[in-house]
Amino acid sequence: SGNENLALVTRGRRASEFVDPNNPGELIAWQGSWRALERPWSWAPAWSNYVEAWVQINFPRLFFNTLMIAVIGLIGTLLSCIMVAYGFSRFRFPGRNLLFTIVIATIFLPAAVTIVPTFAFFQMIGWVGTWLPLTVPHYFANAYNVFLLRQYFMTIPMEIDEAAAIDGASPLRILTSIIVPMSTPVIIAVMLFHLVFAWNDFFSPLIYLSTEPNLQPIAVGLSRFNGIYGSNPPLIQASALMASLLPIFLFLISQRVFMQGVVVTGVEK
């Protein structure tokens, strides 16, 4: 048996008539009452879930911790990566290409290879249980960001540097007054990359801040919250949405400049 569509002629409370598909001149009587099917899904948001998640997860503290780690690391990322990329793109010295190749090759080095010696080193100098292992390494440049910045810097004509040098500008003055202002799109792209990375970073804070819940960022806090309230999906979804609002907002307001910076770095003049 299966479903069959019939043309309704008369609809009644207890009895209805349909056209007989085998004999259109006759009617089929049907005994039964009508009822409306319930909607399988309804929009009924419970805003109390956001309030409860905000309180239970101690979201203000986690937000502050994550923002501080991200901003401190962002300062180091911009300072170190811009300086290194400027050196590779504007200065000629023996072994420049070889050194740049070695720097870029570190991108392919898995983090799992260095995590044990890195943790042992930070533990030896007493940094475990602090933000230092999560922030200080960013002051030593990142190969991926160096590559993006270097490629963008190379699209800026050298004639601009030469004209500034003739006017008496030092290399540092050329960097701060010419290169950096002209590289706003790629710098914003690097900023967004770092902020999203710091906001989503889970493994490093987990191993370095496992004994310090008051210093943990939002990714670790959400994982702990999920372990406690895993049987309550509304709370988990509310907390995850609140945690993702800032990266989404930053990307939306910077989307045009971000895409411009990423695209232009692939064009070398």
Where are these regions (language model features)?
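A structural signal for multi-pass alpha-helical bundles of membrane permease subunits
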Residues: 1, 5-269
